[in-house]
């Protein structure tokens, strides 16, 4: 089977001097017959390109309720998770090479954001739709910090209206 991808840059945002630029894109995936299979939306940050006077990044309201989560799920990011994720085709050395990561102001190699996103998806699906992963049809996240390998994590889930939930994925040691 062959897939056709249509990738469109939809927005550029100036996060300010020293804060970078954000690029939003939308990728539509079609099968050979032209049927739309899924749409992926992504915001990519370029930390060195801000401060050019462009449109500022809009602030979205956080959907997380001001109450304790309905569920807290404990898990652990393995010590080699960043290396395993590299097998998907990630070639960015910041995820595997300590010297590269440190040169960019990080403590060391970190787990790719999409890998962390996958953890959230797996944990949330197992709790909200046990045995029925096909029921998860949309998921949105904003990454706020890096996640290092060999880290205990928690997924905090808030059940909202029918078919919707909010979440926060955190380092269990630092919150």
Give the ranges of each region predicted by the language model.
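Catalytic-pocket segment enriched in acidic/His residues
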Residues: 99-174
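HotDog/MaoC-like acyl-thioester-processing domains
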Residues: 1-73, 148-150, 154-175
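Catalytic strand-loop segment that frames the active site of acyl-thioester-processing enzymes
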Residues: 32, 44-111, 125
């Amino acid at each position: 089977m062959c897939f056709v991808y249509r990738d469109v840059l939809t927005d550029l945002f100036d996060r300010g001097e020293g804060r970078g630029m954000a690029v939003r894109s939308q990728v539509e995936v079609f099968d050979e017959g032209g049927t739309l299979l899924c749409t992926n939306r992504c915001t990519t940050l370029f930390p060195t390109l801000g401060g050019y006077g462009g449109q500022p990044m809009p602030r979205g309201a956080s959907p997380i309720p001001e109450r304790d989560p309905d569920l807290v799920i404990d898990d652990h990011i393995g010590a080699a998770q960043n290396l395993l994720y590299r097998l998907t085709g990630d070639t960015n050395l910041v995820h595997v090479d300590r010297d590269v990561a440190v040169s960019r102001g990080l403590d060391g190699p970190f787990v790719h954001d999409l890998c962390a996103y996958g953890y959230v998806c797996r944990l949330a699906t197992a709790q909200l739709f046990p045995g029925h992963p096909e029921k998860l049809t949309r998921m949105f996240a904003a990454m706020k910090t890096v996640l290092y390998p060999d880290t205990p994590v928690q997924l905090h889930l808030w059940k909202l209206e029918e078919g919707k939930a909010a979440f926060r994925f955190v380092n269990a040691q630092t919150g």
